[in-house]
Amino acid sequence: MSLDTPNEKPAGKARARKAPASKAGATNAASTSSSTKAITDTLLTVLSGNLQARVPKELVGESGVELAHLLNQVLDQFAASEHRKHVAAQEIDQALDALIGLVREGDLSRWNTTTEDPQLGPLLEGFGKVIETLRTFVREINEAALRLSSSANQVLAASTQHETSSTEQAAAIHETTATMEELKHASAQIAENAGSVARVAEETLGAARAGRGAIGEFIQAMQQIRSDGVAVADSIAKLSKRVERIGTVVEVIDEIADRSDLLALNAALEGSRAGEAGKGFSIVAAEMRRLAENVLDSTKEIKNLITEIREATAAAAGAAEASKSATESGEKLGAVAAQAVEGILAGVQETSDAARVINLATQQQRTATEQVVASMAEIEDVTRQTTQASKQATGAAAELTQLAGRLAELIKRFKAD
């Protein structure tokens, strides 16, 4: 028993000594809880957007003072960083607004935005390079627009002049083509007329040859009556000289034919006076008259060309009327008729040859004219196409000029210097 009592006393002292330690632990726990709550509240306040919130030192215990101090420093740095970000964002917004405003207004010469923030410097420098690039671009486009406008105006002027020239050329070619068409028709008509003249000349030549044969018979009959042909030769020489003085051979035909008709009539009259002896003479005179009338019928188609022949025939008839002797008159007139027929043959031959030459020439002219008309038609078609192309080029040049002017107006909105 006595041994147990001493053992119990020391145990009671131990419990007495442990009581203060438990009280201190409770105090420390309360202080830690208060510090934790203060820190937590502060962090929640910061997270809600209040960057000025700090951990109150009076709300933390001794153990949390150092932690609160460190946390407040961190919050200070965070707030400063957020402030710098905010300032940088404002400067960026201002720079962007300034850039957009300059682009909207077109005045690129007023860009001079600077910053003291080393982090924003490269960004603003990049903006400055963009502006400088835009300035260079605007200047180059402006110069190009001016050159384009000048070139477009020159092209438009040249196209307009070319269009005018093409239109005038087309009108001239059209008029020339119309003239050539008229010439073509005229050449065709001339060719037809020349062919008709050639045919009539051939017919007249045949009639003249027939008349020459009849005149030969008549001369033979005259020679049987009268052998003296000196006066007839003189008359023929005079008539030949007169015929040579006549300007156109065709007119001689009508004159000689008319004269032959009168001579035949006179010969018939003389033959009638001679009675039975002049019967053969009358027959030949009648045949000569018939042939002369045939020649007259043939020469009616070229009446306008043989007026002088009528005059010569009339002159020969007048000379025949002056003859007192029927034999001499018949002999002279027969010789004159023979010479006249020879002249007619020569003249008709020349006329026929000339008509053939003219006919050939007119046919060649007609062919050449048709070729020229065809060529002019092709030229007119090409000219029409050229005129249309010129009008299209003028329209394109005018549109290009308008576009160049529009581009110049747009570029004027931007000021690079």
Curated annotation (Swiss-Prot):
Transmembrane segments: none
Single GO MF annotation: transmembrane signaling receptor activity
Biased composition (Low complexity): 21-34
Region of interest called Disordered, as start-end residue ranges on this chain: 1-34
Biased composition (Basic and acidic residues): 1-11
A Pfam family that the UniProt record links to this protein: MCPsignal
Keyword Cytoplasm among record annotations: yes
Location of the Methyl-accepting transducer domain: 144-380
Any one biological process term the GO annotation gives: signal transduction
Gene Ontology annotations for the cellular component aspect, listed alphabetically: cytoplasm; plasma membrane
InterPro entries associated with the record: MCP_chemotaxis (IPR051310), MCPsignal_dom (IPR004089)
Keyword line: Chemotaxis, Cytoplasm, Methylation, Transducer
Subcellular location(s) of the protein: Cytoplasm
Chief location: cytoplasm
Function: Methyl-accepting taxis protein necessary for the proper aggregation of cells to form fruiting bodies. Frz genes define a system of signal transduction analogous to the enterobacterial chemotaxis systems.
PANTHER family reported in the protein's UniProt record: METHYL-ACCEPTING CHEMOTAXIS PROTEIN 3, PROTEIN ICFG
Family from the record: Belongs to the methyl-accepting chemotaxis (MCP) protein family.
Name by which UniProt lists this protein: Frizzy aggregation protein FrzCD
Organism listed in the record: Myxococcus xanthus
Gene (name only): frzCD
